């Protein structure tokens, strides 16, 4: 049968189109205005000015940002002496990674239900002009002053549509104030999306020094094991981890009758260490794709797992993902801002920044 040349060309173009569609997913996009972030950060846009002018900077309805606990400014403002920094924009390109506990009807039952969306992971990835990568985590319980509302509160409470800007813009304004770092781009993922990404990689390796668990949400044996997305998520967000005390014991019905005790030292900071370890472990999995098809499966999983800002194109986002393969993950600086524990008068546990962010990075030789 004679095949029409034009038909061959058409089929070729169609195949290329299908191939490109599969490679470049349809990420959810969100507006992100760096100029608005600057205005919020400087205090030029606040809830007071909005009430005075009647101006609205966001069409989104306010949502529950998590902890509504507000601390008395005159009592706690003296604790924020390190919450400002020189600008360091010229040193890095910065990416803000926000992990939220937003649930949907498809979310794992072990995580329960919750209204609204809280910033459970706040991670800044900084890339200098030598392509050296540093990861800086900000604990969710860090005490800050919100430049929009002027409330003194935990930093995760600033991830909300409070009238000044979007959730990401408001959080970026807080970060600009306490770090001197302008966020260039952000990416946001939910619990469900996080699980989906890990499952698309056929699991991720987690190594622990002790057999540990939290209720029925996870149990990890001492050593290294490859786990699915649900178990990995439950592990990094766990606040009530227990460790095995002695030998693992089962009764005649196979029920666990072992002795378990609370893990000592569990805190927001230990959760951050787990988050960083897991993210690097994920990056290493990306670095070791066995085939292009496995890469396609991973990229396709991102379609409903991430939200990215509108200032970065889908093509650029895909290139960034592919370029992760070139990173020497052993040389990534994993940092957590130095903090101290503080208990408020009503018994709330918060963290206080112990060192100015500029001085902190200087001490790590990252501003040379």
Please tell me what each predicted stretch does.
Residues 4-7, 11-12, 18-368:
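Non-catalytic, solvent-exposed segments at the cell envelope interface
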């Amino acid at each position: 049968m004679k095949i029409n040349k034009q038909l061959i060309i058409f089929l070729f173009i169609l195949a290329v189109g299908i191939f490109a569609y599969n490679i470049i997913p349809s990420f959810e996009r969100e507006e992100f205005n760096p100029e608005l972030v600057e205005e919020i950060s400087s205090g030029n846009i606040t809830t007071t000015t909005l009430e005075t002018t009647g101006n609205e900077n966001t069409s989104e309805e306010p949502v529950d940002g998590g902890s509504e606990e507000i601390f008395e400014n005159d009592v706690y403002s003296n604790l924020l002496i390190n919450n400002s920094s020189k600008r360091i924009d010229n040193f890095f390109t910065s990416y803000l990674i926000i992990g939220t506990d937003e649930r949907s009807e498809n979310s794992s039952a072990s995580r329960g239900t919750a209204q609204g969306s809280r910033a459970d992971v706040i991670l800044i990835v900084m890339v200098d002009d030598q392509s050296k990568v540093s990861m800086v985590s900000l604990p969710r319980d860090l005490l800050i002053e919100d430049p929009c509302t002027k409330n003194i509160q935990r930093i995760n409470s600033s991830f909300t549509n409070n009238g000044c800007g979007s959730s990401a813009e408001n959080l970026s304004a807080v970060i600009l104030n306490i770090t001197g770092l302008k966020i260039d781009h952000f990416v946001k993922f939910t619990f469900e999306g996080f699980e989906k990404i890990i499952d698309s990689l056929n699991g991720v390796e987690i190594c622990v020094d002790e057999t540990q668990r939290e209720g029925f949400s996870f149990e990890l044996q001492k050593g290294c094991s490859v786990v699915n997305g649900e178990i990995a998520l439950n592990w990094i967000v766990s606040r009530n981890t227990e460790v095995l005390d002695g030998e693992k014991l089962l009764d005649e019905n196979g029920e666990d009758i072992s002795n378990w005790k609370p893990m000592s030292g569990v805190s927001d900071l230990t959760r951050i260490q787990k988050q960083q370890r897991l993210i690097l472990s994920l990056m290493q999995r990306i670095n070791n794709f066995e085939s292009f098809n496995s890469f396609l499966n991973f990229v396709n999983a991102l379609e409903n797992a991430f939200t990215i800002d509108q200032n970065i194109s889908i093509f650029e986002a895909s290139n960034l993902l592919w370029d992760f393969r070139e990173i020497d993950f052993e040389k990534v600086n994993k940092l957590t801002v130095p903090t101290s524990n503080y208990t408020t008068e009503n018994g709330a546990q918060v963290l206080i920044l112990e060192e100015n962010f500029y001085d902190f990075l200087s001490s790590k030789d990252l501003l040379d």
